[in-house]
């Protein structure tokens, strides 16, 4: 594959990730609303740690673990920020 073909492949993946991101943030918004009604805090550190460990084990690529964990942590932060605005 040449550079342009690889970039097109990344573009397709980015489109798929965008759709998944929109779905995830919609669910996150609903979780934020439910937490508000239930009087629960937005932040659940134990759950975040559990997810990080579970995903780390499932990733199957030790080289990518620190990058994927950084990605997830940023995603958690964005979700919490979004929930604060609900």
What residue spans do the PLM features occupy?
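Domain-level signature for soluble enzymes in the chorismate/prephenate branch of the shikimate pathway
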Residues: 1-86
């Amino acid at each position: 594959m040449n550079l342009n073909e690889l970039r097109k492949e990344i573009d397709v993946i980015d489109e798929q990730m965008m759709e998944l991101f929109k779905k995830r943030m919609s669910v996150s918004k609903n979780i934020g609303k439910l937490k508000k009604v239930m009087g629960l805090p937005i932040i659940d550190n134990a759950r975040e740690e559990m997810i990080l460990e579970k995903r780390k084990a499932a990733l199957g690529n030790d080289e990518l673990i620190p990058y994927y964990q950084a990605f997830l942590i940023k995603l958690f932060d964005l979700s919490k920020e979004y929930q604060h605005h609900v």
